[in-house]
Structure formats: structure tokens, C-alpha cells
Amino acid sequence: MSGFNPLNSPLIASSSLSLKEAYYLEKLSLKKGFKINYKLSEDSLNLLEKSDLCVLFGGFSNACLNENERWILESINQSKRPYALLRPLQDTRDLQENCLFASYEIHTEAAILALILRGILEKTSQLKGHVLEKVDVGYLSSEANMSEEELQELIALIVKAKKRALVLNREIAKHADNAFLYTLLSGLQNYLEILHIPCYDSSATTAFYDSKDQEWLLKTALKEGVLPFKSQLKSKDLELLERMGEANGSFVYVSYKSLETPKLSFSKQFKIANRIQHSKAGFQILDKTLECELEESPHLKGLIAILEGAFFDAYPYIPILSHSQGIS
């Protein structure tokens, strides 16, 4: 391990880490409270350049890109390759001609991964006898609020491509049920190369996790009581797909952008639902009350606002508990 002790210091890790390493680092990060910044390696950039298709799972809001997201979008757009963007936030600024965009319901990442894996298995004639054969596609699509047509279009793109990359953001890494997500990803990594890119500020970090440290990582995780994720899906795991949390009310999407005064950008629908009438208000988000500047944006849709200037190292969609103008 180069730098200092990662159990109480920020840490840089490569975007091309194995699923096992990323999982244990994220669990230890949550347990010990240190931040992880994933850095795009040269290998990762080469992989992206050689991919016929990139599936971007989460993030990539042009209103507030992090350094990894910016590099990836530049790489894709220079070559005009097709890519897919999957996330709950709906922002028309992010809809490019070469982009297949599909939104889904907050907290339903497991359903989306299961549907993608099942779709690939079906299209490649490998579904018969697989655990996911029993999954009700209509039910899961409905729970995730993604149409079966959008799903079929996405699966067709993936199967058609010869080299594919799946780029994981905070929606996966910081998810409360990420053990199950990593089990699903274990199946998907047979069909897509997987990269991890959550990054707040790698320039401010000196400690670097290297794959040579894997033995130390596994020992530390065991010592800290971190349970491993299952490498293969079992029938009883499908129960987890029926217990996904519901996302009711209004949410903020936490951006990486730094501002002196926090700013909340939102849709007309959000403004009406939350009875917003002024240019500033105090919002309670997790354990903080933030005095935010308010701005209606014609580009945004739905009940998810973009929060800039107040970073939470967590799953990026956070419910608004209350605000000073009487949100319920």
C-alpha cells in the first residue's frame, strides 16, 4: 500500500479493479468512514476506446460531471460510438444523438441488472435452466419503471456489440444492498468489461490501493466482519428482487460540484409539488439543513432535483425530509 493507512484516510483505486476488490473497499469505506476515489487507468481508457458500446450505469449529468465522467464522454463523443445511459435523473441536456437513454426508479438497480442479464442470456440462447428464467420480466420492468421496449432496445445494442464496457457509478458502489448487486454483476462480467468510476477529487489523495494489496484487503475485510457477496445467483436470491425499497416523495441528486452556497435546480413539476415560491430556502437532507439557492430548470423532469455545493459520500439520490416552506 503506497501512501498512508486507508482505514482512516482518503484512498485512490484503479477503475479496473476486480468486483471483489471494489466490493470490499466500498464496505470498508462505509464501516471506517474513509473516501475512495477511482482513477481511470491507461488500461481502462484503452478498453473504452476499443469498445463498440459503453453502458453507463448512473451519473453522467452534464450539469456536474466528475473528472472520470468527463474523460469517458470525451472518448465516446470523439469517435461517435453508441452508448447507453441508465439513471433515475431525467435531464434533456444529456440526450445526445448517439445515446440510448433509459430512466429507472430510484433504488431499483437490482431489477435493472437482473433484467439486463436475463435479456442477454435469452438472446444468446443460455436462459434455459438459469435461475433468472423464472423472473417475471413484466413485473420487474414495472417496479423499475422501465418499459419492456426500452429494455429490449438496450439488450439488442449490447448483444450486437462485439466489445462492451459497463461503467459503474455511485448508484451501484454506494447502494445499501450492494452485495446482491455484485452477485448480479458477477454474471454480467462474462459479457461486459466492468469499470468503477465514482470520484470526488483524486488530486487531493495520496494513498493508492494496488491489486498487489489484495491479500491485505481480504484479511482486513474478514477482520472487520465484512461478509463476502455470493459469486453465483441462487433461486432464493430472487426474493430480494421482490423486496426493493420504494422511492416516494422528492429527492436530490447529489453532484460533485463545489459552490460557496448550495444550489438546488429542479423541474416545474418539482416546484409545484414542493410549493416553492422563493429564490432561497432551507432543506433538510440526511442530518444537515442546507440553505440553498433555488433555480427552476427547463431541462429537468420529475421529482429529482440536482444539488450542487454540498457533497454526501453516499448513494446519490437522497430524499428531502423537509424544507422551510412546509414540504410534507
Residue ranges and their predicted role:
Residues 19-22, 66, 110, 174-175:
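Loop/helix-junction capping segments adjacent to catalytic residues or to phosphate/diphosphate-binding pockets
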Residues 32, 100-234:
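Active-site phosphate/pyrophosphate-binding segments
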Residues 3-5, 9, 14-17, 25-27, ...:
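A cross-kingdom feature strongest in bacterial/archaeal respiratory oxidoreductases
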Residues 37-145:
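Glycine-rich, acidic loop regions that bind phosphate or pyrophosphate groups
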Residues 20, 25-36:
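Long, structured ligand/cofactor-binding scaffold of large enzymes
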